[in-house]
Amino acid sequence: SGLEYGTIAIQRYERSDGTNSWLVTIPGTDGQPDSPFGWAQNVELMSADQERRRKADSARMVAEAMRQAGIGKDEPVALIGHSQGGIVAATLASDWAEEYTIEHVVTAGSPVANHPIPQRTWVTSVEIDDELVAALDGAANPVTDNWLTVQGHVSPAPAATPSTVHSDGSCTPGATPITGLTPYDAAPVAGSTNGRELSHWIKYHQAAYQNATDLGS
């Protein structure tokens, strides 16, 4: 987009047979007035009207970037996106199916249950059960052979506890609570800083996916 925000990443992988595969990483809403990833685009992307979805600035930007990158019609593409980025990914898989071979869509915290993603595309959706955004479509994700939904649960942050002095004189510090807007704002997660992030934050979705992987899901 030429901006410090609203930026996507396109990576090309050359396979052993000389053909290419591609990975497109799409950001979420940044709310900037001149960004293609503004608030209004979310409404357009979730429309039941295909033409309206295709006209969303964020979807058009990603489609144009893919064209300029030289992605061929028959070259496999994986799309990964958080929040609005996931809705864009679902829109591209649904509405650009004739232009590209979208093999895999990965969404994190994205309301995409109503998108008509074709059966040829594998979908992995990561959702956190206490946060609102992924539920804005008002529907559960399809239960099909090509659609996997990973649902994470964020435990509340620990309450304050006193320090413990042991018989040998050593001391175990107690937990110091970090307060936020909800009990989940301060729940510890790998990569967090001050613990004030909402559970829509991408780190929660990454942690949920990693936990599911560790459990053998």
What is each PLM-predicted segment?
Residues 1-23:
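Flexible, membrane-associating and regulatory peripheral segments of lipid-active enzymes
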Residues 26-60, 72, 99-104, 110-217:
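Lipolytic serine-hydrolase domain surface
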